Amino acid sequence: MVLDPFCGCGTTVHAAQKLERAWIGIDVTHLAVGLIEKRLRDAFDWVQFTTHGVPQDLAGARDMAARGRDDKNYYFEFEKWALSLIAAQPGNLGKKGADKGIDGNLYFGPKSEGRAIVSVKAGDNVGVAMIRDLRGVIEREGAGIGVFLTLTEPSKPMITEAAGAGQFDLPGFAPVPRIQIVTIAQAMELRDRAVKLPARRDDGFKRAAREEDTKSQGRLDL
């Protein structure tokens, strides 16, 4: 058994998985755990592991968000966890100051020249004004796409407002919606495939090199 109690970017658990050793990795942040999950899935086709300490279903996500309403530190961990679902890089790099409406970033394009701004909402009350705000942020920042990542299902006016932003076109690729509403439920099921990006580049979380298949099973703790 290989134990890494401060697994960070996951180098040790990656090596243990490659050597077909049983392993346990532990880290204190959801961002690190999300990074390691992605690294293992990218590198090993049939990897199996259990992650403890993160929401496993929508009820768990709602519980985590509710705790964050009373504890800002916990809220930031919810935000980082939500961003990790779609492999987005935190927009404020973990700082707790004003984020100017930018909770996360995704990059795309042949040279990673494109940028999608992510806004995370954990509250029960979401509305069309938030979609307008996100549209204003991407226009201010010169970003191509805005992603509204929400725990609560969007209303019809929100969906209509997002559709009104039109399409983003990158030469050589199919157009995608300029404003995309993605629920946490969708992100938990589809991961980074929940967001439509042309020629996506995972600059926030570099893709691990593909390793030979292994059937070993590990465990990842938070």
Regions found by a protein language model. Name each.
Residues 1-32:
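Extended, hydrophobic alpha-helical segments in both membrane/secreted and soluble proteins
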Residues 24-222:
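Mixed-charge (Asp/Glu-Lys/Arg
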